[in-house]
Amino acid sequence: MRAFLFILFFFPTLGFSQDHQNIISGNILGSSSAIGLSYERIVSDNLSLELGIGLIGIGAGATVYPWKIQTSSLCFYTGFKVSSFVLVDVGGGTVAYVPFGASFFSPANWMIGLDVGPANGKLVSSSFGGATSETTRFYIYGNFRLGFRF
């Protein structure tokens, strides 16, 4: 975790060509679990790291843009994202997925993105009686986000 935080906050200060290296976005699904906010740091022209917090969980991820991130263009990406969530009186779980999507970065520093991809989710259910069950399944997961670059 320390290495991730070091890369997220200090590595980008070495001078990459991006003028606006930070993104705050509102998300549905994705690294912020159900609904939440995420902070994304662009660490190079092709890589960004993300931390998210939502109503029921937290998450993190890395996004790789095969082609350079450019303003006023559709930028395709993939990566790896993980989120963990807790539902009071029900249980919790984790979701790991590989997104395939696209983001549009406007000249006014707004961005919008959408992705879908294969996911592996684990849910641990519990009840007041002490009984627990664990379910792991493979499914499709995604993310819709609207954010601001600064």
Where are these regions (language model features)?
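Membrane-embedded beta-strand positions in outer-membrane beta-barrel channels/transporters
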Residues: 36, 59-61, 97-99, 143-145
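Transmembrane beta-strand segments that form the barrel wall of outer-membrane beta-barrel proteins
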Residues: 20-56, 73-86, 112-119
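Sec-dependent N-terminal signal peptides
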Residues: 3-14
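Residue-level signature of outer-membrane beta-barrel architecture
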Residues: 41, 53, 64-66, 102-104, ...
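Outer-membrane beta-barrel "beta-signal"
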Residues: 62, 136-150
